[in-house]
Every structure is written in C-alpha cells, then in structure tokens.
Amino acid sequence: MTQRRRRRRARRGRFGRRAFLAGAGCAALAGAAVLLGRGQTASASSVPPTDEAEPNAALPSGEWRAVWVSYLEWAGMDFSSEEAFRAGAAELMDNCLSIGLNTVIAQVRPFGDALYRSTLFPWSHLCTGEQGQDPGFDPLDVLITEAHSRGLSLEAWVNPYRLRSSAKMPPALAENNLVNVHPEWVCAVGEGLYLNPAIPEAADYVVQGVAELVQNYAVDGIHFDDYFYPTTDAALDAAQFAASGAGDLAAWRRQNVTALVKAAHDAVKAADATLRFGVSPQGNPDNDLGQQYSDVKAWLAAEGENAVVDYLCPQIYWGCGYTLQSVSY
C-alpha cells in the first residue's frame, strides 16, 4: 500500500456510513445542489433521511459540503512553478475550510486533457498555455496534499466526452489529443468536439482514464459532469445506430451512456470500494432523460452488483418557487 493510499485511508475513517444525505454544492462558489445517495429518491421538499437504508461505505455519515473548482478557476491560478501553484492551492483549501466545506471537487480533465501526469491524455493547456506541455510538477498531487493536510476530501472531476468546447477552448490541441489520435471516435457539434458516445472503444478509453486516476492518485472519488450526449440530432451517431439494429434511438443512446457510467463506477470500486463515484446531472431529470440520454433515476435506483453511482449531485440553480423546474427525482 502506498504512502498516499495509507494517508487517504486514515483520513477517510472520520466519515462513517450512510446511503442518503443532503449537502450544499457550488460551482465557482455559487449555486446549490442536493446530494442523492444510491437507492434513494428525493424532491425539493425532502425531509432529513432516516437510518433505514442499507449503509454505503463510500458516503459520509454527516453532511457533504462541497465546492466545484472548475477550469475557469484554474485559469486564474499561477502554474509558473510548483511553489506558486501550491500557494494558490493552500489559499483555496483554507477558503474552503473557512466557510465550512469538507469536500473539494477539482476539475482535472475538462477537455480530454489532464491536470496530472497521464499516459492517456495530454497535459492541459491550463497549466502552461499550451496543451501537451509538461508544467514540471503535478498539480493534482499538490491539490491532494493540500486538501488532505487540512482534513478535506478531494474528488477528481472528469468531463467524459468533451474534447473542445469551441474553436478557442482549448486554443490548440496537442498531437496526442484524441482528436488527432482517434479522429474516428470524434464528432463535431457546432464548434465543439466530443467523443462519440456510441463508439465503445471511445467509452473504454474514458474508463481507462478513470482507472488511471484512482490507481495512481489518493483521490477520494471520481466525479462526472453532465456532459453526456452533446445533441439530440439523429445524425450524430446514425451509422452506429443503424449497425446496432436497435429499434428506439433514445433508448439505445441511454444504454450507451449508462454503459459508460457503469463501467466507470466499476473501475473506481475495483481500485477501492470505499472510493466515491458520483455524477452531477442537470437539475431537471426530464432533460437528462430526453436531451442528454442519461437515465439518472435508474442509476440512482440500481444497487448491489448493478450499482451505477454512489450519488447524484443535481445542478439545481433555482429556488423552490421556480415552478418551471419544480421536478423531483
């Protein structure tokens, strides 16, 4: 057992077990979220959970108070040296502690890249300004050290399919970006570039990236964002759909996404059953189901060997009085 893993195991002992909990989340310290544990359901008016549900070793026993730290925040960090980045990371973690948080969800693969040493993905342009260029230190290792030294949990946040959000983000792609290595896996939606969710080899590669993270870093979990199918356009995966022989496009697409999420969950648990695997879907499950082909209710209900997620953290960016989004999980 590595020193990092021993340190993470010792710290995790302070959390305990429960299958359902509610907590606050925020993106750039704004917005709210409800955390739903596997096998449970909740609505905007949910009462505090009972202890009747079967315990889930991956979930804390108390509140899960988390913050999303996105690539937008990394753009404001100093990556010029390990010392400079560590100073910024220390300030970030101190700020999290000062407002009562206990978990940091750090975006480490925003564009098919890596803010860590990877054999699968190029270095993120956020580190040096150029995708593929080694910054000379490991930002994720620094983040983990600074978080754990303060008793904070750190989850690695991965965007599974997105490779480029526009022609300028990232500004240029490395030679070993999947756009260049496996162009047959890539689909374009507007100016964005994405892995095609209908191609199993592409999904397998994403899962390999998850395994690389949990095997090599003392993270406390893996967190997927809501970037699943990038469009409802039937042309996106028409060739794969025709070859599949499936009869219903929407159901088939949901199967593709669920297969990826399930495989990622299993890769996390294969490394350590106490690690968390969660997804942050859109706050409206109807949109998840019909627009991004993410059957989040089924994921939440699945248990045992069929488990898909430990938790969902819906992106609920509205108040209880906003009736257009008053839907329940």
Language-model segments: residues:
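Aromatic-lined carbohydrate-recognition surfaces of secreted/lumenal glycan-active proteins
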Residues: E155-N159, H223-D226, R253-G290
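N-terminal secretory signal peptides and thylakoid transit peptides that target proteins
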Residues: R6-A27
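Aromatic-lined substrate-binding rim segments of carbohydrate-active enzymes
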Residues: P110-V158, W252-L260
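Catalytic domains of carbohydrate-active enzymes, especially glycoside hydrolases
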Residues: G88-D113
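Active-site-adjacent "subsite" loops/lids of carbohydrate-active enzymes
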Residues: G62-W64, W68-E83, Y161-E212
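Substrate-binding cleft/loops of secretory-pathway carbohydrate-active enzymes
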Residues: R276-C313, W318-G321
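Glycine-rich, aromatic-flanked loop segments that form ligand/cofactor-binding clefts
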Residues: A66, L101-R109, P139-V186, H223
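Aromatic- and acidic-residue-enriched segments that line the glycan-binding/catalytic groove
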Residues: Y116-T128, R162-V189, Y227-G245
